[in-house]
Amino acid sequence: MNTMNNMHLYADSLGIHPADHYPTMNEIETTDNTYPRYTSPPHPSILHHPQAPEPAPPRAQTAHPPAWALTSQSGYQMNEPSLSLTPEHRPAAGPPNGPNLNHDSDPRRPARRQQPCGVGTTRPLPGCPGQGQEPSRRRTTFTDSISNPDSTIRCWDHGCEGRKFSSVGNYRRHLREKNGQAKMHPCPDCGRVFTRSTARNFHRQSGTCGLIPSQLMLQMGMGMQLQVQMQPVSQHSLASGHPPAFNLAPPVLLEPLADWSEPSQMDLYAASGVVFD
């Protein structure tokens, strides 16, 4: 204690204030029956150091990831639900544009298709214009004839005036003939041109090859007359069961037996007793 008092007196004589003197860690007051006690004040750096903020508690995991995480993922990864989410926090899957009113809730029933206008409808529909009106009359085209086999195929080109055809092949051949694209089949004997090989072969086999049109018409008329004459005889022979008693020969063209020139007329008159002056 005397030593401490002496040190204070020495400091006062030098003009040093006791507050400016900070004792070191070695200056310790000790008493009997007590523990050592530090008398030096705390360090100024400890007094003026700002207190560090307490760490924030961890945030609870949300059900939706941040926006930057969604943009970095691919399309199929964005559609998949997060595996870390519990079932009760997962969003319910639903249609992107709201509920579909046209879809039937029963999966066992097939989906209904919207029927187009004019197909299988007998009553006029409000959304279909022109329904319930009388259809306009129009000519049947080749496309309509193909789609409807029961309809008659006609050609309405110039000069045909609705000519009928029994099949599509005949109609196409007719178009090729009009356009000059049909294959020609000439007769090697008379040079007559046919558009069908069957017509050319019939022409050669029937004996009409080499005849002029007037002779051909005469032969055709004779054939028709022969058929008319033979028809009742054949019916009578079939009814009686006996063949006809005579054979019918084709008619023969009679050539003129006399020359009707002027001298022949004079001889005819002289033979009858007529005398001319």
Swiss-Prot record:
Family classification: Belongs to the GLI C2H2-type zinc-finger protein family.
One GO BP annotation of this record: regulation of translation
Biased composition (Polar residues): 27-37
Subcellular location: Nucleus
Alphabetized GO MF terms: zinc ion binding
Coiled-coil intervals: none
Region (Disordered): 23-66, 78-146
Protein name: C2H2-type zinc-finger transcription factor
Transmembrane spans: none
Signal peptide: none
Annotated zinc fingers (C2H2-type), start-end: 185-208
Organism: Emericella nidulans (strain FGSC A4 / ATCC 38163 / CBS 112.46 / NRRL 194 / M139) (Aspergillus nidulans)
Record keywords, A-Z: Metal-binding, Nucleus, Translation regulation, Zinc, Zinc-finger
